[in-house]
Amino acid sequence: MFKEFKEFALKGNVVDMAVGIILGVAFGAIVKSLVDDLLMPGIGILLGSADFSNLFLVIKEGATPGPFTTLADAQKAGAVTINYGLFINTIVNFIIVAFALFLVIRNINQLRRMTEKPPVEEAPTTKDCPYCLSAIPLKATRCPNCTSELKG
């Protein structure tokens, strides 16, 4: 059983998939930092809110009544919140990852198209019988289906 697992785990596609997942997680962390630390503060300043991650709506007060200045304060008090600022950050994160993935796949597809050989058109090997319209070999002098004699 261990031998079978070892064969499975060391196959090329399994190893490639594992490397892809690890790189994907690392890339996701980079994009998250890009969104949280570089993009969203700038967008927040332009839109008048310095930090999108602290945009929330209190649905139910917690042990300590509000108003709360940060999401952490609301959560510490036990308030139930809708965290739409974090959701906006997540959407921006997704858009960046999706766009980066699109660019990678587009480039891979372009490389594949460059390396593909154009399809070779083969000469036809059959023709249609003029009497019964069945496909017959090009060199046939008589149709095997309707037994008509064929000219030339």
From Swiss-Prot:
The entry's cellular-component GO terms read: plasma membrane
Whether Transmembrane helix counts among this entry's keywords is yes
The entry lists its GO molecular-function terms as:
mechanosensitive monoatomic ion channel activity
Taken from the record, one Pfam family name reads MscL
Q: Which UniProt keyword terms apply here?
A: Cell inner membrane, Cell membrane, Ion channel, Ion transport, Membrane, Transmembrane, Transmembrane helix, Transport
Q: Which domain of life is it from?
A: Bacteria
| Signal sequence coordinates | none
> What membrane topology was assigned to this protein in its record?
Multi-pass membrane protein
Which residues does UniProt call coiled coil?
none
Regions that span the bilayer: 14-34, 39-59, 85-105
State its location(s): Cell inner membrane
Primary localization: membrane
What does the annotation say about its assembly with partners?
Homopentamer.
User: What PANTHER family has UniProt attached to this entry?
Assistant: LARGE-CONDUCTANCE MECHANOSENSITIVE CHANNEL, MECHANOSENSITIVE CHANNEL MSCL
Q: Which family does it belong to?
A: Belongs to the MscL family.
What the protein does comes down to: Channel that opens in response to stretch forces in the membrane lipid bilayer. May participate in the regulation of osmotic pressure changes within the cell.
Protein name per UniProt: Large-conductance mechanosensitive channel
* Native organism: Syntrophus aciditrophicus (strain SB)
UniProt gene name: mscL
